[in-house]
Amino acid sequence: MSGKFIVIEGLEGAGKSSAIASVVTHLQAKGIQVETVREPGGTPLAESLRDLVKKKWEEKVSPTTELLLMYASRVQLVDNIIKPALSKNRWVIGDRHDLSSRAYQGGGRELGDELLQKIRKITLGNFTPDLTLLLDVEEKKGLERARERGELDRIEEEDLAFFQRTRQRYLNIAAKDPSIIVIDANQSMLDVHQSILRAIEEYLF
């Protein structure tokens, strides 16, 4: 079986980490070789860029600067880790991909989807995930979960309106793209994981 690239998306506190662990266990039980990656990050250089993005700076970080750092990290990961793994027929499970930038920078930062699409075309070309699972959680609930984990980073400290714009952009894009499956992440963890595994079975097997 050829390699597949599955991405788990969602706001802070949506439950991406536990969902990824569930997907990995499910696929490995089928005898599939699986690699996991995260964005931003995933290579030494990309992890350094992640630190720059999340750090709390004394100066204002331009939304465009933030966006370009995200894509620099993303290209490094795709070219050095994801594409080589797929070429070896391994499955890659990603904690975020460029849908995050379209939602967070395009929606939350209000840069607009036209700019995001142009940058995506320049940096990634026609490379896209085989399936994206969007864990949709109510903004307040997601932020409460994130705060319970500990100290928030620069982006996690944004106000509620930022996350409302981000969530709405996620849902608007998903409504027009059949490769993005929306999962209700307000359910119990067990129900969320079952919904995810059903979607994977339906769309990729």
Curated annotation (Swiss-Prot):
Top EC group: transferase
Annotated binding of ATP, by residue:
G10, L11, E12, G13, A14, G15, K16, S17
Sorted keywords for this record are: ATP-binding, Kinase, Nucleotide biosynthesis, Nucleotide-binding, Transferase
Name this polypeptide is given: Thymidylate kinase
Spell out the Gene3D superfamilies in the cross-references: P-loop containing nucleotide triphosphate hydrolases
List, in alphabetical order, the Gene Ontology terms for molecular function in this entry: ATP binding; dTMP kinase activity
Q: Which gene encodes it?
A: tmk
Report which reactions are catalysed by this protein: dTMP + ATP = dTDP + ADP
Q: Which NCBIfam families match?
A: DTMP_kinase (TIGR00041)
Q: What is its EC number?
A: 2.7.4.9
Q: What does this protein do?
A: Phosphorylation of dTMP to form dTDP in both de novo and salvage pathways of dTTP synthesis.
Q: Which family does it belong to?
A: Belongs to the thymidylate kinase family.
Which top-rank group of organisms is this from? Answer: Bacteria
GO cellular component terms, alphabetically, are: cytosol
Annotated GO biological processes are: dTDP biosynthetic process; dTTP biosynthetic process; dUDP biosynthetic process
Give the originating organism. Idiomarina loihiensis (strain ATCC BAA-735 / DSM 15497 / L2-TR)
